[in-house]
Swiss-Prot record:
Enzyme class: translocase
Reaction(s) catalysed by this chain's protein: a quinone + NADH + 5 H(+)(in) = a quinol + NAD(+) + 4 H(+)(out)
UniProt-recorded name of the protein: NADH-quinone oxidoreductase subunit D
GO molecular function per UniProt: NAD binding; NADH:ubiquinone reductase (non-electrogenic) activity; quinone binding
InterPro entries reported for this sequence: NADH_Q_OxRdtase_suD (IPR001135), NADH_UbQ_OxRdtase_49kDa_CS (IPR014029), NDH1_su_D/H (IPR022885), NiFe-Hase_large (IPR029014)
EC number: 7.1.1.-
Membrane topology: Peripheral membrane protein
Described function: NDH-1 shuttles electrons from NADH, via FMN and iron-sulfur (Fe-S) centers, to quinones in the respiratory chain. The immediate electron acceptor for the enzyme in this species is believed to be ubiquinone. Couples the redox reaction to proton translocation (for every two electrons transferred, four hydrogen ions are translocated across the cytoplasmic membrane), and thus conserves the redox energy in a proton gradient.
Protein keywords: Cell inner membrane, Cell membrane, Membrane, NAD, Quinone, Translocase, Transport, Ubiquinone
UniProt cross-references to Gene3D superfamilies, sorted A to Z: Cytochrome-c3 Hydrogenase, chain B (1.10.645.10)
Domain of life: Bacteria
PANTHER family according to UniProt: NADH DEHYDROGENASE [UBIQUINONE] IRON-SULFUR PROTEIN 2, MITOCHONDRIAL, NADH-UBIQUINONE OXIDOREDUCTASE 49 KDA SUBUNIT
Record's subcellular location: Cell inner membrane
Organism whose genome encodes this protein: Methylobacterium sp. (strain 4-46)
């Protein structure tokens, strides 16, 4: 019998694949049904964000961050605002801190709802995304009532937030919380307890503690392996040090553990939201929502009607922008997908000299080849879904 050289089979996964979660192209090398190699091709959504920020003022640069992880926009703005505030050395009013914390947790719900339900859809369950999007719609309306926009909010500004919450919004968010917990329980029973979902996800894409550290993972990818690292707890920012919440961690580091953690994080987010709402109602939660420094934040409309100086401040702020002292700073937040960091270099002018964006999805996607080797072709979409990738932030 003559020997035949067996050649591996290469296929393209994407860029328009329904399970690719964006414009991802994977070149898969298969031996039968077993994945031998995965070659991710990124950059199909590259828009040159970091370079664009260098020619915009600090205020004009803020909306670019909404367009990175567009599933939870305000969490990205948060990191940039923290970086600018560190360089300016300004203190954010307490009410603004509470509003920021509240909307960051709403962003976490938006992201986790989308991820858990669409990953269930990749596995074959069609009901969860329909339930999840119904809840996301309510949260989008809260975004819209606070900022005027459902998606690209541009609500967080250096020095605070753009405007105070409209009357009645705090009551409506509070009315949303308890029924939402019931929806989370229903999703938990439908997805996490599902026999088929378990068969598709348990012991798939296992990440050990050492591997998670070596690949530079953060967020749920790190906690799924049993490392209790959460920036909200480890390096508290804004009002998180006042909040009581638990950090759920996994045991096995597989795709199933990561989805269980995301479900539990939604419950913890609601817990934080309730505390924020109570503090916003308290007497010490009242007051301004942006810094009173006229060089950084615009004056009130009332001031502008009366004062020539306020009008000049307003004009200079929106034409030239504020000048940030020369220096460099790294600010990171616990975004829903992991540690989202902004390394900002200022040269004393009104524009950033350099703004490096550290996207968690980028670090997670680089391990795709390592995680998929030896798995079946059908497991690739399970692993990709649990990485929680959004291409706005990967390609930037």
């Amino acid at each position: 019998m003559t020997e035949h050289s067996i050649r591996n089979f290469s296929i393209n996964f994407g860029p328009q694949h329904p399970a690719a979660h964006g414009v991802l192209r994977l070149v898969l090398e298969l031996d039968g049904e077993i994945v031998e190699r995965v070659d991710p091709h990124i950059g199909l959504l590259h828009r040159g964000t970091e370079k664009l920020i260098e020619v915009k003022t600090y205020l004009q640069a803020t909306p670019y961050f909404d367009r990175l992880d567009y599933v939870a926009p305000m969490n990205q703005e948060h990191a940039f605002c923290l970086a600018v505030e560190k360089l300016l050395g300004i203190e954010v009013p307490r009410r603004a801190k509470l509003i920021r914390t509240l909307f960051c947790e709403i962003g976490r719900l938006l992201s986790h709802l989308l991820n858990v339900t669409t990953q269930a859809m990749d596995v074959g369950a069609l009901t969860p995304p329909l339930w999840g999007f119904e809840e996301r719609e309510k949260l989008m309306i809260f975004y819209e009532r606070a900022s005027g926009a459902r998606l690209h909010a541009n609500y967080f500004r250096p020095g605070g937030v753009h405007q105070d919450l409209p009357p009645g919004l705090i009551d409506d968010i509070e009315a949303f919380c308890d029924p939402f917990l019931q929806v989370v329980d229903d999703l938990d029973a439908l997805v996490i307890g599902n026999r088929i979902f378990k068969q598709r996800n348990v012991d798939i894409g296992i990440v050990t503690v050492d591997a998670a550290m070596a690949w530079g993972f953060s967020g749920v990818m790190l906690r799924g392996s049993g490392i209790p690292w959460d920036l909200r707890r480890a390096q508290p920012y804004e009002a998180y040090e006042e909040m009581e919440f638990d950090v759920p961690v996994g045991k096995n580091g597989d795709t199933y553990d990561r989805q269980v953690i995301r479900m539990e994080e939604m419950r913890q987010s609601v817990r934080i939201m309730k505390q924020c709402l109570a503090k916003l109602r308290a007497p010490d939660g009242q007051g301004p929502v942006t810094t009173q420094d006229g060089k950084v934040a615009p004056p009130s409309r009332r001031e502008m009607k009366r004062s020539m100086e306020a009008l000049i401040h307003h004009f200079k702020l929106y034409t030239e922008g504020f000048h940030v002292p020369a220096g460099e700073v790294y600010a990171a937040v616990e975004a829903p997908k992991g540690e989202f960091g902004v390394y900002l270099v200022a040269d004393g002018t009104n524009k950033p000299y350099r703004c490096k964006i550290r996207a968690p999805g980028f670090a997670h996607l680089q391990a795709m080849d390592w995680m998929c080797r030896g798995h079946m072709l059908a497991d690739v979409s399970c692993i990709l879904g649990t990485l929680d990738i959004v291409f706005g932030e990967v390609d930037r």
